[in-house]
């Protein structure tokens, strides 16, 4: 098991109060494979550095998880298939 930090940028038209519960459904992949979710932090709506899918703003969320590499890969795949997710970035924390 490794530590990861996942940043997700969501469609700005979503209601910010529904972001954490909707991310929680994706995080069941991590919990189902024996991983743990340390933190889910919703930063709120922020301006993007450049336009993504005709949006100039996005709702940022940062998630800290401890999981196997295959589990995180599956989570990233599922997030990428969701139309309300504009961009994801997975970083391994605590490496070396």
From Swiss-Prot:
The gene is rpsF. The keyword Cell membrane does not apply. It comes from Mycobacteroides abscessus (strain ATCC 19977 / DSM 44196 / CCUG 20993 / CIP 104536 / JCM 13569 / NCTC 13031 / TMC 1543 / L948). The lineage of its organism: Bacteria, Bacillati, Actinomycetota, Actinomycetes, Mycobacteriales. Transmembrane segments: none annotated. GO terms for cellular component: cytoplasm; ribonucleoprotein complex; ribosome. This is Small ribosomal subunit protein bS6. Keywords: Ribonucleoprotein, Ribosomal protein, RNA-binding, rRNA-binding. The keyword rRNA-binding applies. One of its GO terms (molecular function) is small ribosomal subunit rRNA binding. SUPFAM superfamilies: Ribosomal protein S6.
């Amino acid at each position: 098991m490794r530590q990861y930090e996942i940043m997700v940028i969501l469609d700005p038209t979503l209601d910010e109060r529904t972001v954490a519960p909707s991310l929680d459904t994706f995080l069941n992949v991590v919990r189902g494979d024996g991983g743990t979710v340390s933190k889910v932090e919703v930063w709120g709506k922020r301006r993007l550095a450049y336009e993504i899918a005709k949006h100039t703003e996005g709702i940022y969320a940062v998630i800290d998880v401890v999981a196997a590499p295959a589990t995180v890969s599956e989570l990233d795949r599922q997030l990428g298939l969701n139309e309300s997710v504009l961009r994801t970035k997975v970083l391994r924390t605590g490496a070396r």
